[in-house]
Amino acid sequence: MKNDDLYQKGMEIRRTLHGEESFKKSNTVTYGDPLMTNFIKVATTSVFGALWARPGLDLKTRALVVMISDACTGQEAELHIHMIFALKQGWTQEEISEVLLQLMGYIGAPKIREAMLIAVKVFAEYEASLKSAKKASKKSAKKPTKKSTK
């Protein structure tokens, strides 16, 4: 695949993982700075376009794998992002919690404690975003249509 193709595939995958609103926000807020724009272009091509797009694992499994990697290496900011990806790909809060607890015997309680504290925040944010989206959906469904008066 050419770099342009990898970049486009990476953009599709990032959009899928983030969701449209979060994807747009990350591109303008997090990656709006020229330095960060260069970072995300390379990451979109080489990580999302080349690695996440590989055959053999679905996005749901890949989201869990990177979340586990972040917990094991203490990458707290990335863990936050990838935990949201895992939730959006269908992993439940209970499954994510159990995965983290399973890791405790292998990477230690301190790292898992930090990961669990992040999970508390992520789960609360995720629940709030679901409620907000549901509320917005109900509002838009209730809006009366304007009748034309001729």
Where on the chain are the PLM-derived regions?
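Acidic, glycine/proline-rich low-complexity segments that act as flexible tails and inter-domain linkers
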Residues: 1-59, 88, 114-150
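Short alpha-helical scaffolding segments that buttress acidic/His motifs in well-ordered protein cores
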Residues: 43-47, 64-69, 99-106
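Short gly/ser-rich anion-binding loops that grip negatively charged ligand groups
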Residues: 55, 69-76, 105, 109
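Short, conserved micro-motifs enriched in small and acidic residues
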Residues: 59, 63, 110
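Mid-chain, well-packed structural core segment of small domains
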Residues: 64-67, 71-97
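Preference for long, well-ordered alpha-helical segments
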Residues: 95-119, 126
